[in-house]
Amino acid sequence: MSKSFSLISNRRKDIVRWVALGVCLTGLVPVGLAYEHNASLVHFEEYSDNVIAQTQESGKPYFLLFSAEWCHWCHEFSQQTLTQKDVADYLNQHFTNVFIDVDIHDTTYVKYRALGVPFTVFLNPDGSLYYKYGGTLYGDDFLDVIKEVSASVGPGKTAFGIETRVVSYEPSPGLSIDNLLNFPVAFRRGVLDNFDSEEYGLGREQKSILPRTFLYLLESGTDDDQKEALGWLTKTMERAIETIYDPVEGGFFRYAETRDWRVPHYEKFSDLNAGTVLLLYRLNEIKPSPRFIEAADTTLRYLTSTLYDSDLGCFLNFQVADTNYYFLNEKRRKAVNPPKVMDKIFSDRLAATLNYLIEVNEYVNDPKLEEQVIRSLGFLEQMILQGQEIRRYFSAPEHLWYEPGGLSDYAHLVHLFIRAASHFENLHYADVASTVLHASILKFYDKNSGVFVEPAVGSNGNVEYLMALNGLLAQAMIGLGDRLDEKGQSIIERVITYYSLMGEALEDRFWDAVDWHFTENYVVYLAAIDQFAATEFSSRD
């Protein structure tokens, strides 16, 4: 029988409780190497799907470090803690250490239900979960933790760590029109009721822009729902522009740690910013605002300049955080190097960015933006049609694609090329989408459950994550229309049916939410419901 006990003393509990303030919140294929850790004093194993099985003979517990190149606090942990000799020596002697780049190994991040980065997972020597937490601990505090872990681990043992929200779910046995109609209503009401009436934004903890969710609120529901959403979102985006927006170069930062939008995390992501630009143009269309137009235009210029590589012909994904640079005015910034723009391009991030930008160009009608979008589509298309399988990411310095793509890559690519086919009235893009969809069905579709499953996560893994990816694929298949065969039509209905009872989990999710990014997963599936219902009802008419 496993023994469960508290890992750390009361003082250490306080340290770990507040460490979240240092979290950066979610054929032959070349194997890419994660960034920076090769020179570390800590001897890290490179992550692979079988790294645990291959190293169990050592009998040591595992230290899994989830990190990201764009994350300020990840670099802080590496530079301030892992460079301490007694920490590195202890880890090397008593642990098998595994470094996991969360962008390359995104499915492993989902598998362990990690929250933010850096994120630490300790496994027992048998590979079972012992303890996990998010954030940065410094030298001696971290050393105390790893010593206690080393002394306490054992087969089946656990310690009280961060409690990751797990949504338990029994799939619907049959399709119910009532469930399909009630789910979006419950979602909209729950989200609208949880806007912060004093500081704005969703919830009363950390604050961020949620483009999918906010756009969905503006475009769905009753007239009264949309009017209420407009009021909340206008105030929310005004606060975002005041607090997490870069007025000099454009672009919005990833999120703010506090309810009142303080302590920004200064990473800039392409998909977040493309979605935010679309949101601002949409808000301005409904209720004109010079402030929104200025922020949207400036951020779009940032995307089409700083985050566009004209040599590669595609958009880049990330500009890393810098806690000093963004306090400088325009003149002083010219005297220093700007934060690095990452030279890796991830398939799903690029696809999500382009999906937004296609719609953005309907507002701005900019030939330059259209050319950049088309070139980026060609960049992805070349990988899809010339390679033997979808790849996870492209390394600009090596001009090589690395790692097999996961379900997220396939789903985002199918959805993108269906959108492109419709927008540009180009059947070739529909052919590309069909190619990726066929490969998705062969690689990820589970006939028993009737949904697409990421093997690393499993059908009983993160149900909200899988719901979103299934929602993207369902939307794309509906978009294929007459090009979809009878088998594809059956898959759509099975996917919609499987997740149709997820609305029952909403009350608990709304009650204790801290990070509201989970809503982004729901709206993808809800959009699929809307499309499915429209086609079903029209066919019956």
Regions inferred by a protein language model and the residue ranges of each:
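N-terminal secretory signal peptides that target proteins for export/translocation
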Residues: M1-R12
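Catalytic cores of eukaryotic secretory-pathway lumenal/extracellular enzymes that build
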Residues: E69, F99-D101, Y266, Y393
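Thioredoxin-like thiol-disulfide oxidoreductase module
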Residues: D49-I52, K85-Y131
